[in-house]
Amino acid sequence: MLVNSQDLSLSSYDYELDSKLIAQKPLNPRHDARLMVVSKDNGPNLCVSHLKVWNLLDELRAGDLLVINNTRVLKARLRVRLKSGAMAELLLLEPHGDGRWLCLAKPAKKFLPGDYVWMEALEQESLKLQVLTKDLETGGRIVQFPQEFSNRKSIENLLERYGEVPLPPYIRQHDPSDADRYQTRFASTPGSVAAPTAGLHLSDEILNALIQRGIEKASVTLHVGLGTFRPIEEEDLTNLKLHSEWVEVGEEVVSAVQACRSRGGRIFAVGTTTVRSLEASFLLGGGSMKAFQGLVDLVIKPGYQFGVVNGLLTNFHLPKSSLLLLVSALIGRERLLELYQEAIERKYRFFSYGDAMFITPEAVLPGAKSPRVLQ
């Protein structure tokens, strides 16, 4: 699939957005969010419908497969006290073994290697953490927790009790209810520091209705971290690299995809993290899905050919983000930016708590389909 130079320039993925369109809280019920359905007429033109997420029931059919990301967001933000007495914060990103964690520190310049910081939310005496080193790749800090927190489960318990939900910075006011509403209804595997936001739209009611209509469901796990939300800094995207994230695609997912293909069904990903998980499995299998677990740094941008995914439910993403690149790979950058402009004109709500877009198989660029898989 040919791409032009603009497709590989970060500035080509910019757009202007009125801050009033950045959703500050989700709708209730979840499935009441607006849904831009992108299909195609009998010719080359896209056909756009403006519906509600509940209408997803009318876009899917019996035999289709909906794949979700079952990761659960950790309360990964910790308030700590510096040796100066000032308060600061750590955002725990990923474990590095033996009680060591990669963290984003704020303000970073106050966290020097060798320093100690203290958590004071505990009933007992304050918990002392040591800053070991600066991580050159991320600009974060490797922080050592005490011996009693050397395994992941003990840290997860600590965060659940004393941590805070790490909402994106564009959500200005935090609410206690965010602990629930910033989780998908199927979040079951702790490990993310941001939600797979497309899944936030799927209420229990719509999930049950999908099952009743014969639409199959399968789950992957991708723990959302820097690879998803870290801003891209380089203008030339030719050799873009993303920070790796932990993924698990089980045998049951591989079987579900194969069964769906056999019966002539279509495979829809809920969110860009699910897309990356499925496509990583496809690439690792050399053109056939393979069950695996491990770190993935797959970059999907225009020119990529999809081997698994036929369609996508996704949110409206930040300018110049890796998520925008991924969706552009599916339907084309210029077409996507035109759709975003239409969404802005129609006052759609953007980003994590915002509205959604549903890309049907008909809207996918012909060149974006891998010749190795029957689409």
From Swiss-Prot:
It is found in: Cytoplasm. The keyword rRNA-binding does not apply. Keywords: Cytoplasm, Queuosine biosynthesis, S-adenosyl-L-methionine, Transferase. Transfers and isomerizes the ribose moiety from AdoMet to the 7-aminomethyl group of 7-deazaguanine (preQ1-tRNA) to give epoxyqueuosine (oQ-tRNA). InterPro entries: QueA, QueA_dom1, QueA_dom2, QueA_sf. This is S-adenosylmethionine:tRNA ribosyltransferase-isomerase. Its EC number is 2.4.99.17. It catalyses: 7-aminomethyl-7-carbaguanosine(34) in tRNA + S-adenosyl-L-methionine = epoxyqueuosine(34) in tRNA + adenine + L-methionine + 2 H(+). SUPFAM superfamilies: QueA-like (SSF111337). GO terms for cellular component: cytoplasm. The lineage of its organism: Bacteria, Bacillati, Cyanobacteriota, Cyanophyceae, Synechococcales. Belongs to the QueA family. It comes from Prochlorococcus marinus (strain MIT 9211). Pathway: tRNA modification; tRNA-queuosine biosynthesis. One of its GO terms (molecular function) is S-adenosylmethionine:tRNA ribosyltransferase-isomerase activity. One of its GO terms (biological process) is queuosine biosynthetic process.
